[in-house]
Amino acid sequence: MGDMANNSVVYGGVKNSLKEANHDGDFGITLAAVRALMELRSTDALRKILESYGDVYGICTKLKTSPNEGLRGNPADLERREAVFGKNFIPPKKPKTFLQLVWEALQDVTLIILEIAAIVSLGLSFYQPPEGDNALCGEVSVGEEEGEGETGWIEGAAILLSVVCVVLVTAFNDWSKEKQFRGLQSRIEQEQKFTVIRGGQVIQIPVSDITVGDIAQVKYGDLLPADGILIQGNDLKIDESSLTGESDHVKKSLDKDPLLLSGTHVMEGSGRMVVTAVGVNSQTGIIFTLLGAGGEEEEKKDEKKKEKKNKKQDGAIENRNKAKAQDGEPMEMQPLKSEEGGDGDEKDKKKANLPKKEKSVLQGKLTKLAVQIGKAGLLMSAITVIILVLYFLIDTFWVQKRPWLAECTPIYIQYFVKFFIIGVTVLVVAVPEGLPLPVTISLAYSVNEMMKDNNLVRHLDACETMGNATAICSDKTGTLTMNRMAVVQAYINEKHYKKVPEPEPYPPNILSYLVTGISVNCAYTSKILPPEEEGGLPRIVGNKTECALLGPLLDLKQDYQDVRNEIPEEALYKVYTFQSVRKSMSTVLKNSDGSFRIFSKGASEIILKKCFKILSANGEAKVFRPRDRDDIVKTVIEPMASEGLRTICLAFRDFPAGEPEPEWDNENDIVTGLTCIAVVGIEDPGRPEVADAIKKCQRAGITVEVVTGDNINTARAIATKCGILHPGEDFLCLEGKDFNRRIRNEKGEIEQESIDKIWPKLRVLARSSPTDKHTLVKGIIDSTVSEQRQVVAVTGDGTNDGPALKKADGGFAMGIAGTDVAKEASDIILTDDNFTSIVKAVMWGRNVYDSISKFLQFQLTVNVVAVIVAFTGACITQDSPLKAVQMLWVNLIMDTLASLALATEPPTESLLLGKPYGRNKPLISRTMMKNILGHAFYQLVVVFTLLLAGEKFFDIDSGRNAPLHAPPSEHYTIVFNIFVLMQLFNEINARKIHGERNVFEGIFNNAIFCTIVLGTFVVQIIIVQFAGKPFSCSELSVEQWLWSIFLGMGTLLWGQLISTIPTSRLKFQKEVVHGTQKREIGEEELAEDVEEIVHAERELRRWQILWFRGLNRIQTQIRVVNAFRSSLYEGLEKPESRSSIHNFMTHPEFRIEDSEPHIPLIDDTDAEDDAPTKRNSSPPPSPNKNNNLVDSGIHLTIEMNKSATSSSPGSPLHSLETSL
């Protein structure tokens, strides 16, 4: 280190000459030489530097840069450097072209089948049998108009055209989705900045603007954006596992290993480096180039294999690429990482497994549901074709006794092709291949909108996961507080000052220790700069806590910069950088007489324990006994902490010149025997909006826990101010040590049972390390206390928070205070570091789930009706009332347009009124099932009435049993038109899935929805009135259109009728059918009242009086139920009372088979609640998510009272009884 300081001084003389020579001649080092140098490691690199350049300063000279003042920042010079050494940009993988996306969309099996059938139909339609054989070949319409009989080709052509439309829309969707993701990626890249020195000024520039010759400042937590050589370093340790696979941190120093490589993480320390290679010429870029070239060759070789795997892997690769590219790392780096060895494998396995994680819970559920429905659809379509073929053969050759004529064979084949097309049509509608599509659309929409709410989403699935969040482990500083720190109290000079005093009271030596200790023992990157505008606040650069300590020096009329100029960073002998584990920072100075002095600062309790002396009022050091320390803790530190202040102790120690030099690597022996200078209290005011956000979380069933490194009293005070803690509540506040003592056994191993006893009541974990945070997060996730697995979100800003951020279901990194390592490990970056943004993320997550449920409710209704109509119509009339082209149009409405309309609904505050859905919540709630079956019933009645009697009602010709190639009939056109309009109006019904009556509420807030509904209606008019034969439609009169609209609007009125049917009534009837009449009539009435209260509270605030009536009735019912508790318990003890048919109905058919816990497709949980095996488990969430009281209290009371569970303190039942 001493040599380094000397080098700096020597170099100072040539600094000015370099500035002048900055643009003269070429650089003294070539790009190839730099690349060759950076490929060497440790001693080899050091030897090469010494032999070829003398030292790192020689390299600086060759690169025409100053190690102290950096580049001058001249635009022409920067451009020349980019031209010679390249730009710091690694080009991403080329996006798929629109034609490639079209080709992928064409791979859909059902579309391929339809294309083949359409081509066969098209070919055969041009064959005409001899005139005389027409009668012998069966009913083939020749038509009265000229050319009428020759229009058979139109259906085949129209099917092909429709397939082209579907393919183009699908490809456009994929293209726009990819474009959105790339926009997000570029946004994240723009957010990435790095600190460099240019023209002697420390500035932050975008990573892409860094060029060779820049002097970059590296610090704890940074992700290095380019290759470089160390100029000066303090205790610098790098994690190079991303490049080498070695898990051990590599110590960097000028005399051992000075090379710093791009894509690696700074785990400890700080320093400066000269940038030597950027972009594709850096080590990361070289690997990317190799992988990119290899990848292209592989693509050419394995194109066929890849095509088969495309569907499975596309989304995963895209998400993985996005995740990697966001961090400035090449997309193709991932395979190399996961193939390397070492402990780094575990991290990389996590990343390599990301694609599995990216296929989110919801997407997985939808895919399974689509497969199951698809199987049913395949069966239905096969049966349809078989019935049609048999019907034709029996009718033609058995009943009519026609002979098989060779010349009629093409006609018969045309019939069979027609039947086949009908079967495929049933399959096309039945198979909801677009079911996972709304997830992608909704997530993409949400991700873009969440940016406006200060949530930068890195991993798509995190958006949906947050909707299920049950616990949030939040940092205190910056998240719950404003991170605007200032020293407001101090214990110094043996006095407790409630405000920072004038400099006069201090003895000169105390002031000297204070000024020097703070100036050199804070990172030199932490500065307080003058305000940009006159009268404004000073600008704070660097660490907020350190800037808070620098502030009082200015108040004391002392200039820390003078001290730093006198003792430059290069002159610091040894630095023990701040770590969340040690919770302190220490700096060693070497004096001119050969003695050493160490300054320490850190958490007051930790530093005070290492203090053996304290500076007295007259400035002399006196003995500091344990009881003196206890007095300071009680009289100074605890009062400060109880006011929410962070307490920091400042201390020093001298090492005399005559003694042997200490072993500096043995930190424990160095940082002890200190002399206390002062204890300061730093105020970090709480964010005023956080209390309301936490209230929303609690109402939404989310537990908020503070996990901080601060003093327990400080943490408790802030938690109380924010509303996390309430006086008189039975919650835990623990310190890290106490937490570990409680959860570990004698061998020091963590016991899950012990964690399960603590976490439900834990609200504050203070003086915690990142390991404690990881342990808590893992413990909550692995907990089996509740029936549903807990979904945990965690915030983090430090490098060591990485494991906790990765382990959590939703990892939030701080955008302002967070390190690059924390950001890389996170799922979402909070660009404003504010807790309220997490609550918005929860709201968006729940909105995704609701959007998918809306789409599901809509699509399944269409599926049920279309399949039954096509199947039954084909069997009865030997033809499908809905033609293939019409079905494709319906399919387009169902899949793509409805996805866009329903998956882009903006969220509302009401989403935070219910409990989390839980990972195992069925996709289809009872309310949704009621709506699906109810609307399907209405639509089927209307369609079949029109099908069988429509011609009499409208006084038109019947379209049933029409011959082959017959012109379109008005009859079937009306059926098609009314069917589509019913779907269109039902799309409005589908906007509400919790039984709300006002389906139009907020409809105009969603411009996309309004545009799609109106657009679909206009296209339907065009199809019916002008498309004619291609869509098998005949023009309709105004009266017929009015009837169509009236019957379509009937779904809205029918929806109101369905809403009046209580879901609880349906549940009760279902239980009667299953033979489980255990529910008291009073309880059933109570459930109805609760349902009414839900609607009243949600929609008509003036009916709040119902709450009071309802609560009175609930109180009465609780007493009644309590009275019958024991008798109910006896009744439940007999498992034989459950019939085998009930077990059969409630298990296999309603479950999705998977390695995960069984997730029923339909919410059938309430029918099982009475099972003795579930007597002691908490019931699943109510389908109605918009009412907190119902979910947390009333429903639980009914079920738990029946089950004879005791209302333990802290349980939902206990809290309800207490509130009543």
Curated annotation (Swiss-Prot):
Required for basolateral membrane targeting: annotated segments: 1118-1220
Provide the E.C. number(s) assigned to this enzyme: 7.2.2.10
List of residues that carry N-acetylglycine: G2
Q: Where is the active site?
A: D475
Annotated region Disordered: where? 297-356, 1160-1220
Q: Which SMART domains match?
A: Cation_ATPase_N (SM00831)
Q: Where in the cell is it found?
A: Cell membrane; Basolateral cell membrane; Synapse; Presynaptic cell membrane
GO MF assignments: ATP binding; ATP hydrolysis activity; calmodulin binding; metal ion binding; P-type calcium transporter activity; PDZ domain binding
Cytoplasmic side residue ranges read 2-105, 176-366, 440-855, 904-927, 992-1005, 1061-1220
What cellular-component terms does GO give this entry? basolateral plasma membrane; cell projection; immunological synapse; presynaptic membrane; synaptic vesicle membrane
Segments for region (Calmodulin-binding subdomain A): 1100-1117
Q: Could you list this entry's UniProt keywords, alphabetically sorted.
A: Acetylation, ATP-binding, Calcium, Calcium transport, Calmodulin-binding, Cell membrane, Cell projection, Cytoplasmic vesicle, Ion transport, Magnesium, Membrane, Metal-binding, Nucleotide-binding, Phosphoprotein, Synapse, Translocase, Transmembrane, Transmembrane helix, Transport
Basic and acidic residues bias locations: 312-327, 337-356
Entry binding sites for Mg(2+): D475, T477, D797
Transmembrane ranges?
A: 106-126, 155-175, 367-386, 419-439, 856-876, 883-903, 928-948, 972-991, 1006-1027, 1040-1060
Family, according to the entry, reads as follows: Belongs to the cation transport ATPase (P-type) (TC 3.A.3) family. Type IIB subfamily.
The record, for PANTHER family, names: CATION TRANSPORTING ATPASE, PLASMA MEMBRANE CALCIUM-TRANSPORTING ATPASE 1
What is the protein name for this chain? Plasma membrane calcium-transporting ATPase 1
Q: What is the lineage of its organism?
A: Eukaryota, Metazoa, Chordata, Craniata, Vertebrata
